[in-house]
């Protein structure tokens, strides 16, 4: 009886925790409205969280890590010969149930960005997404603290297309997600990203870029999946375009392939 009770408690505790690890390879790196690196990179993403309540009725808390390493020497856009970045964060996530099939996802995260060639950066990330059976709108804001005051914002739409009801069994684990997004930055971020104008003035706050992505996820098993994606990034801000002298640093197509491990 004691053994059964112990096993039940252990199983209940284990069900509160989950870990997702996703290594991938990309042909380039785009971040906050700029082509950071136009050479192949290897990316690792790790997310570990714990439910607050058996059904996560009080949300979830967790830790997050994202990092990349360049796979080849510098090409056009990268400032460093061999670039790398390591992000670490802790987050709180809460899904507010609105109706059957509708929920508002809310997340806040303090994040530390570490690059070997620069001082560490601390930022806040706040995001929301309205999950529903149709098209999912989402937005994200990133604000550096305390000194630079760079502020980044994006808003977009995505549509996960599931094949669970397909007659062919091999199609059922497939999910295809098209996404469209526009990116904005305040003057501080825009100037830091692209440099000052030829007149010496700062690049003003405004629209940065537009992104279109098509991603396909395939669940091989309950705990293992693979995915591929193609992203088209286009820099729209005319002042930023003038500051980005290489064509590949203004507009770029990024391919990615990776695996997803869930526990």
Positions of predicted regions on the chain:
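Membrane-embedded beta-strand positions of outer-membrane beta-barrel proteins
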Residues: 21-23, 61-65, 90, 106-110, ...
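Short glycine/proline- and aromatic-enriched beta-strand/turn motifs that initiate or cap beta-hairpins
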Residues: 2-3, 9, 13-73, 90, ...
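Outer-membrane beta-barrel transmembrane domain signature
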Residues: 45, 53-57, 142-251, 258-263
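Short secondary-structure boundary segments
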Residues: 105-130, 156, 163-169
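Surface-exposed loop and membrane-interface regions of Gram-negative outer-membrane beta-barrel proteins
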Residues: 56-118, 236-240
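Residues that define the transmembrane beta-barrel architecture of outer-membrane proteins
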Residues: 17, 38-48, 82-88, 104, ...
